[in-house]
């Protein structure tokens, strides 16, 4: 499959360097390859963001300060799967979620949709050194589940993923990527400031979803039932 490097900044003699941040409840100078939760969005990996403020939100809990660990990584020669590029659709991202996150396909429609997406929109993402794509926390995963169950359209799902401006994840998957990562410092995220921001962002996304998106059907909207009935494939222009 295709790899895209357009989001990587060239610097220092033409090499591709990127600054990324990881939110955590502790300082992590040397992330461990192969360590982490298997049910994360893109499987086991080291989950980062290019947005330091977002890392601070990810690092805090309701009663504990967090840390935004800062790193530099040289991406020259690494295979980067950027799911935001035009080569891919929202269904490619959703299929990766279905392969990793626990999803209860309790209805016949959801079960059929899951099987169809896995057969037709699967990517060999495990071959990538780095994956760039949406982050699906609990709120956003529920939006994806609504699409699979036929409650919202493809257009509504695409719009919903931008609610709250949750941002993109920059996920290190391979040993090669881990070896390129250089710890350059950290900033403390105080629970008083950043947990409030975190809760506010999630609340805003949910409110906008139910107020603006979930009940705003448009004529011609594309639903999962149509995708299944017409056996739509990744090259269908309606998915772009």
Task: Mark where each language-model region is.
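A glycine-rich, hydrophobic loop/mini-helix early in the fold
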Residues: 70
